[in-house]
Design a protein with these regions (language model features):
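H-loop/switch region of ABC-family ATPase nucleotide-binding domains
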Residues: 234-235
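Conserved ABC ATPase "signature" region
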Residues: 54-61, 141, 153-170
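Pre-NBD coupling/linker segments of ABC/ABC-like ATPases
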Residues: 2-72, 261-283
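The feature captures the beta-strand-to-loop junction immediately N-terminal to the Walker
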Residues: 89-91
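H-loop (His-switch) and adjacent beta-strand-loop-beta switch element
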Residues: 243-260, 268
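Helical segment within the ABC ATPase nucleotide-binding domain
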Residues: 213-226
Length: 286
């Protein structure tokens, strides 16, 4: 009987997802679903102004093409259980978005290992996966395909996506004419059409009206109750406290603190509220 049930679930997954990487995880609630060990991300920062291919190749051949190494994340260790809600705090450039891109399989670490199980719906950048030249209707199918959904599944969820996004009157309008809030509605509605094992939201809900933000927060809460794992980045500390039970504070690619959301948020807020150190004034020349 158990084998029959497993076979049925596998068939259901095949109707929804076109990629094996997007099939539902077998990880039980409370077990590790995301594991990062000693993850380091390096970027090459080019300070030279090279504006054509000829100059680029000349510098490359003559070994005059110099890069400065930039460490975006350094030796990050993270163990996230299925069903947990994690908030990531830090100032701009701390490495929060980079960390989420690692989990989303967008970036490959220079060193360390990353293990992610199950389906991932990533809302990392406003407009990512959305073609501004296409209509909202066409983008629902395009974005859904990029997330690994089958055409049959997108068609079955089409009305639900449109209803949640509240874009009924703009379905056949080019997305390039949409406001930032309308793009957010569209992207969030598509990403949450099926409850993923892991939902990643990176400051995408910073735009949009208050009513839709509350609607999205309620949707995320419902998904958490059903076992979805949440990775959430926001500069709104109150929102992180409300939505998450765990938090990580990053600063220039390094981990400052990891723990329960209230403790980490309070420590981060205290640091941000502290007066800036006074600038040392140079002594007057005699």
């Amino acid at each position: 009987m158990a084998n029959v049930e497993e076979k049925k679930n596998e068939l259901d997954d095949k109707k929804i997802f076109t990629s094996n990487a997007q099939r539902t995880t077998t990880v039980a609630k409370g077990e590790t679903i995301i594991e990062l060990k000693d993850v380091t991300i390096r970027f090459n920062k080019n300070n030279l102004k090279v504006d054509n291919l000829k100059e680029y190749f000349i510098r490359l051949v003559t070994k005059q093409l110099m890069f400065q190494e930039f460490i975006a994340l350094k030796d990050i260790n993270l163990d996230i259980k299925k069903g947990e809600a994690w908030g990531f705090l830090g100032t701009n450039g701390a490495g929060k978005s980079t960390l989420l891109k690692v989990v989303s399989r967008i970036l490959k670490p220079a060193s360390g290992t990353v293990k992610v199980s199950g389906t991932v719906a990533a809302l990392i950048e406003l407009g990512a996966g959305i073609d501004p030249q296409l209509t909202a209707r066409e983008n629902i199918f395009l974005n859904g395909t990029l997330l690994g959904y089958s055409k049959a599944f997108i068609e079955s969820k089409f009305d639900d996506i449109v209803e949640f996004s509240e874009l009924q009157d703009f379905l056949d309008s080019p997305v390039k004419n949409f406001s930032s809030g309308m793009k957010t509605r569209l992207a969030f509605s598509i990403a949450t059409a099926v409850e993923p094992d892991i939902l990643i939201a990176d400051e995408i809900l910073a735009v949009g009206d208050m009513r839709f933000k509350k609607k999205c927060a309620a949707k995320m809460t419902a998904m958490l109750e059903d076992g979805t794992t949440l990775l959430y980045v926001s500069h709104n500390i109150a929102a992180v406290k409300k939505q998450c039970n765990k938090a990580m504070w990053l600063d220039h690619g390094n981990v400052v603190m990891v723990g329960d959301a209230d403790t980490v948020c309070d420590a981060f807020k205290a640091e941000m509220d502290a007066p800036a150190p006074a600038k040392t004034q140079s002594k007057d020349k005699k």
